[in-house]
Design a protein with these regions (language model features):
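DNA breakage-rejoining catalytic core of tyrosine-based enzymes
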Residues: 54-76, 139-149, 165-172
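C-terminal catalytic core of Y-nucleophile DNA break-rejoin enzymes
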Residues: 136-156, 171-198
Length: 276
């Protein structure tokens, strides 16, 4: 604890999911003690009123994402930065576009011991469709379908680096290059700083134009919100199975969390209720 004073009692509370996880860990520990003959029974399994500790929610947690207005200002900020300093910020613009349009995680843009993202991981199939190969969460390899707009973004980025319009098979050029030195970016912290710069510029513009609430909420945003935003927008008009596979979700149930049509309709039906 950083302060000289002791933490205030009651200043922190575990969430229901944290309590549930804690009970699971304790239950496993007590089962081990039973196997080693230290205990005869598992006290956690004897908690008949677990609902006393775990709050059940009627609805699922809301996905943290940018609003259409916030995204317009964020990508607009990246475009302005690229126009003012292309040597540095054409890369910034590409990063923002890739995180949003291909639902990439931050770890999928940087060089790691398990994967080195390269230009050659953009591939064209025999039908002329472009795909991006990546290795994501759980060390799972997946192909992401590449839209025409993302292909245009790729062409622009490559030309800013003095490369041909689209990559050839096996192109070893790093996907996200260092502006100083050679090779690809290896630090997720550097990507976070790049994205945060766009968020800060967008928040400044939003506040300047009177969108104070949107600017304040943008202050809470993280890099991962861009992935959530891209998925949330696409699931409105793409088959959820297609979005699921591009996002690398383990099941359609995860993708379903991004569909808020029923929630919007529910609120719309309540909007004009009268009290008196």
């Amino acid at each position: 604890y950083s302060s000289a004073a002791s933490p205030e009692e009651g200043g922190y509370a575990l969430s229901s999911s944290s309590i549930q996880s804690l009970l699971g860990v304790l239950s496993s520990f007590f089962n081990y003690l039973i196997q080693e003959s230290y205990l005869e029974s598992n006290p956690v399994s004897q908690l008949r009123q677990k609902s006393k500790f775990i709050r059940k929610s009627q609805s699922q947690a809301q996905i943290r994402r940018l609003s259409p207005l916030q995204w317009d200002y964020v990508i607009g900020a990246a475009e302005k930065m690229a126009a003012n300093d292309p040597a540095v910020h054409e890369r910034t613009l590409f990063i923002m576009q890739a995180l949003f349009a291909m639902y990439l995680r931050i770890s999928e843009l940087v060089v790691t011991p398990r994967w080195t993202p390269q230009m050659g991981h953009f591939r064209q199939d025999t039908e002329g469709n472009w795909w991006f190969l990546t290795v994501g969460k759980g060390n799972k390899e997946r192909e992401v379908s590449v839209s025409d707009a993302m292909l245009d973004a790729l062409r622009r980025y490559r030309r800013s680096r003095g490369l041909s319009g689209l990559p050839a098979i096996g192109d070893p050029a790093p996907l996200v290059h260092k502006t100083r030195g050679s090779g690809g970016i290896t630090s997720t912290r550097q990507i976070r700083l790049i994205v945060q710069k766009c968020f800060d510029e967008a928040a400044y513009s939003l506040r300047k134009e009177g969108f104070t609430d949107d600017a304040d909420r943008l202050g809470e945003a993280t890099v991962h919100w861009l992935r959530h935003t891209g998925i949330s927008e696409d699931v409105k008009h793409r088959p959820r199975e297609h979005v699921r596979d591009d996002a690398g979700h383990g099941s359609s149930a995860i993708t379903d969390r991004y569909i808020d049509v029923e929630r919007a309709e529910r609120h719309a039906s309540a909007r004009n209720k009268v009290i008196k």
